Amino acid sequence: MSGDVPAAVLPRLVISAPTSGAGKTTVATGLMAALRAAGYDVSGHKAGPDYIDPGYHSLATGRPGRNLDVHLHGENLLGPLLLHGASHPRPADLAVIEGMMGLYDGKLGGRGFASTAHVAALLDAPVVLVVDVSHVSRSAAAIVAGMAVFDQRIRIAGVILNRVGSRRHAAEVASAVEDVGVPVLGALRHDSGLAVPSRHLGLVPAEERAEAVAAVELLAERIAAQVDLTAVVEVARSAPPLHAQAWSAQEALRAAGFHPVSAQRDHPVVAVAGGQAFTFRYAEVEELLRAAGCRPVVFDPMSDPALPDGTAGIYLGGGFPEVYAAELAGNTALRTALRDAVRSGVPTVAECAGLLYLCRDVDGAPMVGALDAVGRMTSRLALGYYSALAPAETLVAAEGDRVPGHTFHRTTVTSTGEQAGPAWLLDGQPDGFSSDPAGIGRPTLHASYLHTHWAGCPQAAARFAAAVSTQRPC
């Protein structure tokens, strides 16, 4: 980051672990909630592309949970996005960033690219390690010592012991860890009631847990009782000034060449799928749409009988439509309205769950039918980072554009009829559908498995908003 950029003071820390499954989400979410209860305004962030953890962060902090991903955003955008999240909707006192996987685990073959350590180094943020000691005692200190010296850019500023068996066990481990020069900030007793249940893609979204609010409150109580919050805040305050300027949706659109159309109506409505079946979308998507003059309106495909009044664009993000297939299938009126809107040329972006929802059916349950394709649940997890190529002009990309994205699903979509071209090429393989269902001479439907973060590709938001601004409401 340039030395010419004014320094921003933002206390911050990263919560990481040596491995997956150590309890990062439990500790990070509980820590955010405990700090909030102690009077701090906390900005919650997730390293990596995951949608689920930020939902818990939002419950814990009372503000949007946000992502920081080196692949999706690029190295230079992480600081600006962190500062943006920490200043909206109001200035935060500190930022807590939950890592992904193990501290040094990143893109395969990338030597740690996009790892939590990569994020921590770019943000010059101290790291607090969550160490699962359920099957270890003094050997945990060797793990901490190794993590501390593996990469000299990383400062391990503290350890929180998780799943300790007794006070004696905690004291034994803490003594060994502190002997290698790393302070122990807390020790959490083993408590199965604090675990976050798993879904086939990872954790269960907060929106799907009726008891989520109570669970987060319980986490806050347990963390406050067993972790030294004052010491945690001091770790966050030890982070140096950050040489970056907060990201701006307006500036991002301007840089992408977006210019409001003179004939644009006042704030055209973009219908954004929400509810329990569609929980996966990044906060910056709606912020970019608002900055472009659109009015995002969230609707629930499971229960709403119609699209929002004046819909001129549709955004169907990710989620679990296969889990709620019966409920989605039962909302015949909404499925019909959505199919008619897509076929009439209303600009529509559908990612992963949105792609499935637009199919004719998913595992036999009738869906929207805007695509002549069927979706099926499988046992195989397809995931990875991609630099997607637009093979032709689409609703969100110009021919030849490269856009960063990621996939994460256990389903397949099979075309059962003639479709238009693919939405993207992923490592040379076609993915999704780009089509002109109304025959107006340009693509108005973009449906694929690829998840994109529009802060990292604002040209996608700009193109979509431009199409929406000239669309006649359905």
From Swiss-Prot:
Give the matching InterPro entries: CbiA/CobB_synth, Class_I_gatase-like, CobQ/CobB/MinD/ParA_Nub-bd_dom, GATase_3, P-loop_NTPase
Give the family from UniProt: Belongs to the CobB/CbiA family.
**Protein name per UniProt:** Hydrogenobyrinate a,c-diamide synthase
- Domain comment (free text): Comprises of two domains. The C-terminal domain contains the binding site for glutamine and catalyzes the hydrolysis of this substrate to glutamate and ammonia. The N-terminal domain is anticipated to bind ATP and hydrogenobyrinate and catalyzes the ultimate synthesis of the diamide product. The ammonia produced via the glutaminase domain is probably translocated to the adjacent domain via a molecular tunnel, where it reacts with an activated intermediate.
Q: In which pathway does it act?
A: Cofactor biosynthesis; adenosylcobalamin biosynthesis; cob(II)yrinate a,c-diamide from precorrin-2 (aerobic route): step 9/10
Q: What sort of enzyme, by top EC class, is this? A: ligase
Magnesium in keyword set:
yes
Give the reactions, separated by semicolons, that this protein catalyses.
hydrogenobyrinate + 2 L-glutamine + 2 ATP + 2 H2O = hydrogenobyrinate a,c-diamide + 2 L-glutamate + 2 ADP + 2 phosphate + 2 H(+)
What's a Pfam family in this record? Answer: GATase_3
What Enzyme Commission number does this protein have?
Answer: 6.3.5.9
Q: Where is the active site?
A: C352
Entry keyword annotation includes Ligase? yes
Alphabetically ordered keywords of this record:
ATP-binding, Cobalamin biosynthesis, Glutamine amidotransferase, Ligase, Magnesium, Nucleotide-binding
Q: What does this protein do?
A: Catalyzes the ATP-dependent amidation of the two carboxylate groups at positions a and c of hydrogenobyrinate, using either L-glutamine or ammonia as the nitrogen source.
User: Which co-factor is required?
Assistant: Mg(2+)
Supply any other comment.
The a and c carboxylates of hydrogenobyrinate are activated for nucleophilic attack via formation of a phosphorylated intermediate by ATP. CobB catalyzes first the amidation of the c-carboxylate, and then that of the a-carboxylate.
Extract one GO molecular function annotation from the record.
ATP binding
Could you say which residues are annotated as the site Increases nucleophilicity of active site Cys?
Answer: H451
Q: Which residues form the GATase cobBQ-type domain?
A: 269-459
Biological process (GO) annotations held by this record are: cobalamin biosynthetic process
